[in-house]
Amino acid sequence: MAETVELPSRLAILPFRNKVLLPGAIIRIRCTSHSSVTLVEQELWQKEEKGLIGILPVRDDAEGSSIGTMINPGAGSDSGERSLKFLVGTTDAQKSDAKDQQDLQWHTRGVAARALHLSRGVEKPSGRVTYVVVLEGLSRFNVQELGKRGPYSVARITSLEMTKAELEQVKQDPDFVALSRQFKTTAMELVSVLEQKQKTGGRTKVLLETVPIHKLADIFVASFEMSFEEQLSMLDSVDLKVRLSKATELVDRHLQSIRVAEKITQKVEGQLSKSQKEYLLRQQMRAIKEELGDNDDDEDDVAALERKMQAAGMPSNIWKHAQRELRRLKKMQPQQPGYNSSRVYLELLADLPWDKASEEHELDLKAAKERLDSDHYGLAKVKQRIIEYLAVRKLKPDARGPVLCFVGPPGVGKTSLASSIAAALGRKFVRLSLGGVKDEADIRGHRRTYIGSMPGRLIDGLKRVGVCNPVMLLDEIDKTGSDVRGDPASALLEVLDPEQNKSFNDHYLNVPYDLSKVVFVATANRVQPIPPPLLDRMELIELPGYTQEEKLKIAMRHLIPRVLDQHGLSSEFLKIPEAMVKNIIQRYTREAGVRSLERNLAALARAAAVMVAEHEQSLPLSKDVQKLTSPLLNGRMAEGGEVEMEVIPMGVNDHEIGGTFQSPSALVVDETMLEKILGPPRFDDSEAADRVASAGVSVGLVWTTFGGEVQFVEATSMVGKGEMHLTGQLGDVIKESAQLALTWVRARASDFKLALAGDMNVLDGRDIHIHFPAGAVPKDGPSAGVTLVTALVSLFSQKRVRADTAMTGEMTLRGLVLPVGGIKDKILAAHRYGIKRVILPQRNSKDLVEVPAAVLSSLEVILAKRMEDVLENAFEGGCPWRNNYSKL
């Protein structure tokens, strides 16, 4: 509760825009502007004895006030302060001149306030200082002159509070006694209503009985929501009788609004029966309309829907269909079962972009190249194909370009490339995720006869994006499936065929829609699951995995700034040196893309965020104060500041004044911090050497949906009956490759000195077990043929394979090495694992041009035409055999 205080002759002024602080009210404000922060620092924060500041209402426009007096700043000087030349009695000419200098309209009366709670903070990453201040209004004052002290305003004031003698004299006035009694009666009635409705009000009753009446009016009215004009009116009510009269009027108005709301609720509930419970909200709306004399809501909504349909630009045949549906809707009652479904259908027709298209700007290929280079590092071949696509669109805008399908492992930038195409074309972008879609209705929509029917994802995407010519991304197109509900991939055949998508028919829409203006782009991890007819409608662009050098550049240019921004940090708080990023790439991640790398960087950022947050400190400024709790009330400050305002429950307000500040320190990541946060390294360069430490193990290269990988093959023998066992979750093709490899080795056993005589069986009395580690991962394909032969020769000869050598290739029964796919990804995988030598089929030499030069320069690539060439290079010192090919 506000107490009587003696005001100084000058007060620092904190302006409130369109908001008034009354005596006895408590607010919480957040100061962010330069002027308000400086005022709080100099007048409140830096002073041991917290003084008073003035709260002055300010209008946000240049119009004069109809209540009270508003002032305009001017120019002048007074005792070292830059005066704003305000005098209460200024002439109209002076006001007009001041208005030209500044539009702000300052009220002539304000309220002196004291700080109950004060805290300081630092915004990250900008470093801007902010203050949160809890203020209590004390007493009214009148502004005599308004000036400047640095960036904030100061005013020469006079108090408007009555002396004790004047107050005692007023209390003897019969009119004042009558007004006091009327105010208390009305206020008590309001408190009783609130107590019945909300089970609250006991504390407020105590205030009505204990707080002096001249202070109670301000405190009571401050808790109501009222207009700025009404707030100014209360502030200007210096005379106690006028103040009580206006307060009584406001309290009575609030009481009447509560009673009207109760009347409407009672009227609605009285009309409800058990079968009408579901229409409660609709009945309440009708009752409100009846009170206002307006009961044609449904008719207005239908009319608005009709106007919206007329403005949608539908083709003539579709407009006729829509009119029939609209006439049917007008004949129905809102309670009928089909009313809502018909209305939703018509709203879809009105919302679809039939003729609304993105305004395409003239294609600038140079700008498109710069955009692609800034958003994506590397991928030169892919970028060149996109530029070619854009060049054709520039020369022939209406050309039906191919449907581009980006194929590659996760995390290499397929989706972001599609977004870059949309930006280069100047079109809106919409993404449809097809992963796991097994229902044809997801593409074509559900028929309207079903409950819960809805349009397909294509039509829904066009409705969301709002234009008929967006760039539409069909994401994860290889992840669609099929079951008894249909095949979504087959439904996409019509969508991606330029001859058919002119009149795409969605089952829910039930009218043809032109998709020919849409630019379709697709993404996939693998080509094999895509049906051949659908694959034939798209142009495949392969995105291989990134090299370590490319990952390093991507991390430094894109990932680290993005991760720091997502965690509220900057380079001033966390620094990740290039050497540490390279360490993460080599020892903590082995992937084709960069998602795992980004997750590791995010882990470092989270750890840094914890360390920075722990630097916060608290400084107590005063004692014997209770904790502040109050409901939130919106408010704003003038001069660009931000205010969060709260009205504290009425009563005695003693609060602790505390301050907080943050002092972050920069963190530099080193190897110790890496191991502490990310744990011990997951990979090391000695893995291949450890795995190939014994005979019977070889290193192969395979291709997966996640890019190239290194695959170890282990073989061992035991006493048995000459049988072969295969483990590692293998497919039929790789099992046949293992059988073929064993047959070839048995046939050449004497040539490789694995048997003393040509007719000796190397499997005599023993079994062979071949295992592919990582047994939880399915494996298949013919490219492990040379790896299997090498492992078997190593087993039988007891000669270890070189640990720095990996290989890939299919072999025939006659020992020829056939070409395989995924050469670039496989070489990149070998580079990631620290492999120094790679054996490839000779006919794959043409694929080496796609491998980055930096990777090729760090590897020794050996081309093999026959299996003998592979074995010669797989073992240290070569693999001796007889120079006899008579069995070939």
UniProtKB/Swiss-Prot annotation:
Its EC number is 3.4.21.53. GO terms for molecular function: ATP binding; ATP hydrolysis activity; ATP-dependent peptidase activity; serine-type endopeptidase activity. The keyword Protease applies. ATP binds at residues 408-415. Residues 11-255 form the Lon N-terminal domain. CDD domains: RecA-like_Lon. GO terms for cellular component: intracellular organelle lumen; peroxisomal matrix; peroxisome. It comes from the Eukaryota. The keyword DNA damage does not apply. A motif (Microbody targeting signal) lies at residues 886-888. Signal peptide: none annotated. ATP-dependent serine protease that mediates the selective degradation of misfolded and unassembled polypeptides in the peroxisomal matrix. Necessary for type 2 peroxisome targeting signal (PTS2)-containing protein processing and facilitates peroxisome matrix protein import. This is Lon protease homolog 2, peroxisomal. It comes from Arabidopsis thaliana (Mouse-ear cress). The lineage of its organism: Eukaryota, Viridiplantae, Streptophyta, Embryophyta, Tracheophyta.
